[in-house]
Amino acid sequence: MAMAAAVIVPLGILFFISGLVVNLLQAVCYVLVRPMSKNTYRKINRVVAETLWLELVWIVDWWAGVKIQVFADDETFNRMGKEHALVVCNHRSDIDWLVGWILAQRSGCLGSALAVMKKSSKFLPVIGWSMWFSEYLFLERNWAKDESTLQSGLQRLNDFPRPFWLALFVEGTRFTEAKLKAAQEYAASSELPVPRNVLIPRTKGFVSAVSNMRSFVPAIYDMTVAIPKTSPPPTMLRLFKGQPSVVHVHIKCHSMKDLPEPEDEIAQWCRDQFVAKDALLDKHIAADTFPGQKEQNIGRPIKSLAVVVSWACLLTLGAMKFLHWSNLFSSWKGIALSAFGLGIITLCMQILIRSSQSERSTPAKVAPAKPKDNHQSGPSSQTEVEEKQK
């Protein structure tokens, strides 16, 4: 525990102080620039937000040395970062969102990477605030309230000035064995395909995304995340401790124009993709890789390292000048104030780590798929399924 604290606190000081600087710059631009030009604000925010998010990329790439292996055909790999895309992924690990950031950074669109997330995420210190300024979409997990919020948020992206990725985890929650068991029981009772490696997708958000963005988003990137049997599952705590993991990502590109128009057919298309994803994960379990798929080299750029070194130098210089000016440690009051500040940073880091844990995630309140046989009735309500998955 002491070792973990010794590692987490210095990283936390760097991340949260630099993050507050970034949040302040974002707030100033939001107030002064956005009212005059939304596109100019977005371009500035893209650069500003990336200077913060690259710190987390550095933790994955350089501090923990997590190896992300990407499997995709050349055409798909070469398209990434050159077009707007809806990214649909299974929610396998605690750091799936960071894996997405790594791939976005390699594709040159980290600053315009977006996601649909639960509303509580925007209140996370520094990271959640930066996401809010960057136009992430936050939902309450209540479709009666979220439908209009999602629709308006999606339509606002129509004039986004740079290629963006919008990530959507349609399972609605992170994968655990307990949630899988609940999903299997529900599927069996509803005469749906019984999943083995994924949860049952909640399709309303996906249908809304396709319906509202098909006119300006040309592609859907179907990503499948898997953890090899020889690697421990990656977590935020392992990252901060500098402990490596391996993550496999399979990417398949679908053209948005090839999707059907009716909403029920869009929903069925999504369910079919997760049935195929389940079968693909079966193959991965058997071979401990995605067999027959080409592995692409995504490298490890030094940009994130350069950003972290720059932040560390600036903050160290600033801290030295501040301490020299304030004589903070010359009194018990100053020492107590410093200890209080460290305590706040440690608490914020714990909040960030705990918020990422799959065991603490909750299922989305979105109606499940209907069985293909419309004469069969499913469980009495979605609440019943959610209670089983908790």
Curated annotation (Swiss-Prot):
Membrane topology: Multi-pass membrane protein
E.C. designation(s): 2.3.1.51
The entry's keywords: Acyltransferase, Endoplasmic reticulum, Lipid biosynthesis, Lipid metabolism, Membrane, Phospholipid biosynthesis, Phospholipid metabolism, Transferase, Transmembrane, Transmembrane helix
Reaction equation(s) it catalyzes: a 1-acyl-sn-glycero-3-phosphate + an acyl-CoA = a 1,2-diacyl-sn-glycero-3-phosphate + CoA
Subcellular location: Endoplasmic reticulum membrane
Keyword Metal-binding carried by entry: no
Protein name as annotated: 1-acyl-sn-glycerol-3-phosphate acyltransferase 2
